[in-house]
A protein has these predicted regions:
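Helical scaffold of the NTase/Pol beta-like nucleotidyltransferase catalytic core
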Residues: 1-43, 158, 164-182
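Generic detection of long, well-ordered alpha-helical segments
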Residues: 12-16, 63, 67, 147-154
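Short, acidic/polar N-cap/turn motifs at the starts of alpha helices
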Residues: 23, 100-102, 130
Length: 182
């Protein structure tokens, strides 16, 4: 579970290049993955929303990959110069089939940007379409914050909990990207 947010930092934005570089690889993976975590919340949010850091997490890209699509996903990542990165989780006994791939991009102003993709190999993930993207079904996604996701304090997560409690579909709801009043 994530630490409480520092409310003084609520107006901070994700750099546009981070969104751009992530979307570039996601487009090539679109037909063979299910988006999870921050990118699922991103596509549930209204179009052209402000990319507040506390609305949803764009530090990495969390994906679910059906076992039958793993080879294709790995080929796409390798063709796009992503490399396998070993993590401490690779050595731990787990039911999760987890893989991390990273790529470092040098921007025009010579800043290094790391794009990290965490993917979990699993079939039968409840999912739905949002703006042409396959995303983890929000009610199922909320349950992942107890084991594979950690940004449970983001506004999108907190808003979706409330919306689903009222049987309201979270798709395109402003609450997902609105700075909380309290």
């Amino acid at each position: 579970m994530g630490a409480p947010h520092n409310k003084k930092r609520y107006g901070e934005l994700w750099p546009s290049y981070r969104i751009q570089y992530a979307l570039e690889i996601l487009v090539s993976l679109k037909d063979v993955v299910i988006l999870s975590g921050g990118w699922a919340w991103h596509f549930l949010s209204p179009l052209n929303h402000t990319e507040y850091k506390h609305a949803h997490d764009h530090k990495d890209i969390d994906l679910f990959v059906d076992p039958k699509n793993v080879a294709e996903v790995m080929n796409i990542l390798l063709e796009n110069n992503f490399q396998k990165v070993w993590t401490r989780y690779d050595q731990l006994p787990s039911d999760e089939n987890f893989r991390r791939y990273e790529k470092t991009i040098l921007t025009e102003d010579e800043k290094s940007v790391r794009v990290t993709i965490d993917f979990f190999v699993k079939s039968n993930i409840p999912n739905r379409m949002a703006k042409g993207w396959s995303i983890v079904e929000p009610s199922y996604l909320l349950g992942l914050y107890s084991n594979i996701h950690s940004s449970d304090k983001c506004w999108a997560v907190q808003s979706v909990i409330k919306l689903l409690d009222q049987n309201i579909d979270p798709l395109d709801r402003e609450e997902l990207v609105t700075i909380p009043k309290n």
